[in-house]
Amino acid sequence: MNIGRRDLICGLGGLAVGGAMLGLGSVEARAAGQAQPASGRFDQVGGAFGWKPHKLDPKECAQVAYDGYWYKGFGCGFGAFYSIVGLMGEKYGAPYNQFPFAMLEANKGGISDWGTICGALYGAAATFSLFWGRKEVHPMVNELFRWYEVTKLPIFNPGDAAQGVKGDLPMSASDSVLCHISVSKWCYENKIEATSKQRSERCGRLTADAAFKAAEIINTKIDQGKDFKSTFPMQASVSSCGECHMTKGNDANWAKGIMDCTPCHSGTAATQNKFVNHP
């Protein structure tokens, strides 16, 4: 069969248009597929805890977390989370680099300045649950949070790269995972205003410290698997108070939580009734 030049050109043009339409159709199909649940309500693509964890250099994570803290003012939760998942995205691509990282900005100031959980701790702990379920994450969070309660921080020092205040900062153990207590105690003991650059710098460095520790925990978890255990014992106050207040069947079993009891219930000057005869 003889094919003329005109027929050949028309045929190629038709193939090109057809191929483009097929490509458009596949893009639309993918978009439609992404808009739908994996198989039904509450399911997700890849399954729960379906992402693969990768080892990271804790020192690199710390620096990225510190820089992330200052990035657009997104703060501690963003910096800590990005230092793990964002770095995996930079090194390994999808799905890590597809996460909407800016949503972690909500954790700034203990979640929109409410002073609840330290945003750096939340950002770091949230990364664990991308890879492992509750039972496996529990000892990982215990390790991170109990470390934070008892360790004198900040350890990280950015040197001349400091974005708030250069030089050493006072170090202390917060005894609490709550932003309100951690910040207030440090500011009170060191006579530093909570709205100061020094306080912001401390939080930036704490973000780096939390990221460093979280990366260490993830690396160890990858090596040890289900054998991973927290190296920190239960706090003495939780063990003692829990005998009554966290024991099933006890009339006083109305307390929930395993954070250190003493910062809120020790009866110190800071925990007395401040609404009576307050100046």
Curated annotation (Swiss-Prot):
It comes from the Bacteria. It holds the Pfam family C_GCAxxG_C_C. GO terms for biological process: anaerobic respiration. The N-terminal Gly is blocked by a labile group with a mass of 85 Da. Predicted to be exported by the Tat system. GO terms for molecular function: 2 iron, 2 sulfur cluster binding; metal ion binding. Heme c 2 binds at residues 180, 261, 264-265. Transmembrane segments: none annotated. The keyword Calcium does not apply. The modification Blocked amino end (Gly) is found at residue 33. [2Fe-2S] cluster binds at residues 76, 118, 179, 203. Heme c 1 binds at residues 241, 244-245, 274, 278. Binds 2 heme c groups per subunit. Each heme is also bound by the other subunit. Binds 1 iron-sulfur cluster per subunit, probably [2Fe-2S] cluster. Disulfide bonds: none annotated. Its cofactor is heme c; [2Fe-2S] cluster. Keywords: 2Fe-2S, Electron transport, Heme, Iron, Iron-sulfur, Metal-binding, Signal, Sulfate respiration, Transport. Residues 1-32 form the signal peptide. Diheme cytochrome c which may be involved in sulfate reduction. Homodimer; linked through the 4 hemes that are shared between the subunits. This is Split-Soret cytochrome c. It comes from Desulfovibrio desulfuricans (strain ATCC 27774 / DSM 6949 / MB). The lineage of its organism: Bacteria, Pseudomonadati, Thermodesulfobacteriota, Desulfovibrionia, Desulfovibrionales.
